[in-house]
């Protein structure tokens, strides 16, 4: 293979050259080879040029996982513009805030999807909302024609010989240090921040991920993680672009559909939160599907019990189960390798990927430094300076340990720690104990006010199907395994835990409900 590319346009050109007739994207009935993907991306970039979108402009995508997202994102880059992904769970108010803050000049937006017309919601939210270029993605169908709004295929048809030549010139001019995207943090506390990354970083992350997971052109890569999140984008379809693997996007998570897709598409790589794999393992229809093609799983965002790793390997035929750690500000920091044993995978988040350093700072905070640390927050130098110190160390806000091998164990978030009777309590320690209680599918622990202790723990517990647990059972189990100040004083049984798109539990939501 030729020298590694450092921009997504150069990665696309290399993929078309080296993997040409292999399948790049398999989205239902739509099958695109790498050559066809290149041509559609080029046409999308040419169409942007025809609409006066300039290099450096911000272009947003607010749409679920379909092949259109891949074409649009790479087309935005090919045109020299900056991609702004928008969370499909966002309300029109939240989306408008991002569009305004980024001064977006064009928007790619889903039509009717899960009962919502996102473009209509934007117009309803603001009577002054107006963008010069809006491209609508057909998802559920039945979209009425709207003046000034291009349907996706009609937009591609705007490309002509002159605009394609302009697009090629812009793609060739993209620099490794140009901003490739502005990814907004989940905003679980306060206002979300726009994280800026360079092309070399986005491509470098995908390269490291692909190397650790040993992704090749023989792989079929099911992407359930949203494209608007780094897990679906930089650790998703960009990995496939670099390695010639096939992207199989899934717009809505559904366990039977996941199993059917693994069966039909011979999926080999399946990234996702631990709950995805637990749901597959526990589903009564699992024996109906042939899941033997599965080769590697990459997970994280929550504790991964050793028993789950072992079941994934013995019952789902995974040759390797990997965990990884990162955040929007440094997408992939550490990652396990395919030869790591189940205990290492379960108890750590791997070791630093090439180009990254990790050390433990004050209060056990994990600090990271290296090539893939963000350029900074959009229009927010003050927050950037607070997050990245003068020596270039990114302060993650995560608490953890580093063993002699360089493997990281993420124990908690600094902000999730609470103080009970003068003692620091890290909820993840309690949650790890609860994971060993028979009948517990998952749990989340927060601190709640207490007159005598200051704060005490409250556990939110999701029981496994068909299992009945009592509060006394949970408390008694913890008392046998934890110091008294760590034992939850109350337990709430819930059907599910609130999660952000990366699969992390949104404890701020639980705190709002604590009364």
From Swiss-Prot:
The keyword Lipid metabolism applies. Belongs to the ATP-dependent AMP-binding enzyme family. Involved in the catabolism of the rings C and D of cholesterol. Catalyzes the ATP-dependent CoA thioesterification of 3aalpha-H-4alpha(3'-propanoate)-7abeta-methylhexahydro-1,5-indanedione (HIP). InterPro entries: AMP-bd_C, AMP-bd_C_sf, AMP-binding_CS, AMP-dep_synth/lig_dom, ANL_N_sf. This is 3-[(3aS,4S,7aS)-7a-methyl-1,5-dioxo-octahydro-1H-inden-4-yl]propanoyl:CoA ligase. Disulfide bonds: none annotated. NCBIfam families: PRK07656.1 (NF005801). Its EC number is 6.2.1.41. It catalyses: 3-[(3aS,4S,7aS)-7a-methyl-1,5-dioxo-octahydro-1H-inden-4-yl]propanoate + ATP + CoA = 3-[(3aS,4S,7aS)-7a-methyl-1,5-dioxo-octahydro-1H-inden-4-yl]propanoyl-CoA + AMP + diphosphate. Keywords: ATP-binding, Cholesterol metabolism, Ligase, Lipid metabolism, Nucleotide-binding, Steroid metabolism, Sterol metabolism. The keyword Lipid metabolism applies. One of its GO terms (molecular function) is medium-chain fatty acid-CoA ligase activity. It comes from Rhodococcus jostii (strain RHA1). It is an enzyme of class 6 (ligase). ATP binds at residues 185-193, 398, 413, 504. Disruption phenotype: Cells lacking this gene completely degrade cholesterol to half the yield of wild-type and accumulate HIP. One of its GO terms (biological process) is cholesterol metabolic process.
């Amino acid at each position: 293979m030729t020298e590694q590319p450092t921009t997504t346009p150069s990665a696309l050109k290399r993929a078309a050259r080296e993997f040409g007739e292999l399948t790049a994207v398999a989205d239902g009935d739509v099958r695109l080879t790498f050559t066809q993907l290149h041509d559609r991306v080029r046409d999308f970039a040419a169409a942007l040029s025809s609409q006066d979108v300039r290099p450096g402009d911000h272009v947003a995508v607010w749409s679920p996982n379909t092949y259109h997202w891949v074409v649009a994102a790479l087309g935005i880059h090919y045109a020299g513009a900056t991609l702004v992904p928008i969370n499909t769970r966002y309300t029109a108010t939240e989306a408008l805030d991002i569009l305004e803050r980024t001064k977006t000049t064009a928007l790619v937006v889903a039509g009717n999807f899960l009962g919502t017309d996102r473009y209509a919601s934007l117009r309803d939210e603001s009577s002054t909302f107006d963008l010069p270029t809006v491209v609508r993605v057909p998802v559920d169908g039945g979209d009425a024609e709207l003046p000034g709004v291009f349907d996706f295929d009609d937009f591609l048809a705007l490309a002509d010989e002159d605009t394609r030549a302009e697009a090629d010139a812009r793609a060739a001019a993209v620099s490794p240090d140009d901003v490739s995207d502005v990814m907004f943090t989940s905003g679980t506390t306060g206002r979300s921040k726009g994280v800026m990354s360079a092309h070399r970083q986005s491509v470098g992350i995908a390269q490291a991920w692909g190397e650790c997971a040993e992704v090749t052109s023989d792989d079929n890569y099911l992407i359930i993680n949203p494209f608007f999140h780094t897990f679906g984008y930089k650790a998703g379809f960009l990995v496939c672009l670099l390695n010639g693997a096939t992207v199989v996007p899934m717009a809505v998570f559904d366990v039977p559909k996941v199993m059917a897709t693994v069966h039909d598409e011979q999926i080999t790589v399946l990234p996702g939160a631990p709950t995805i794999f637990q749901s597959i393992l526990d589903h009564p229809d699992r024996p109906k599907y042939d899941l033997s093609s599965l080769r590697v799983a990459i997970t994280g965002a929550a504790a991964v019990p050793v028993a789950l790793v072992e079941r994934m390997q013995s019952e789902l035929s995974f040759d390797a189960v990997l965990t990884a750690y990162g955040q929007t500000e440094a997408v992939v920091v550490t990652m396990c390798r395919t030869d790591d044993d189940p205990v290492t995978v379960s108890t750590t988040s791997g070791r630093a990927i090439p180009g990254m350093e990790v050390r433990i700072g004050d209060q056990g905070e994990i600090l990271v430094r290296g090539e893939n640390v963000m350029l900074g927050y959009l229009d927010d130098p003050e927050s950037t300076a607070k997050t990245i110190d003068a020596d270039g160390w990114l302060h993650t806000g995560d608490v953890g340990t580093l063993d002699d091998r360089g493997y990281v164990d993420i124990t908690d978030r600094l902000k999730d720690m609470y103080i009970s009777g003068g003692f620091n309590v890290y909820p993840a320690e309690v949650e790890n104990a609860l994971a060993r209680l028979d009948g517990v599918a998952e749990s989340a622990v927060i601190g709640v006010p207490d007159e005598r202790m200051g704060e005490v723990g409250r556990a939110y517990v999701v029981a496994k199907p068909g299992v009945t647990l009592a509060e006394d059972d949970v408390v008694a189990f913890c008392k046998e395994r934890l110091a008294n100040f760590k034992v939850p004083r109350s337990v709430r049984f819930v059907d599910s835990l609130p999660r952000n798109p990366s699969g992390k539990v949104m404890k701020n939501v639980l705190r709002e409900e604590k009364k």
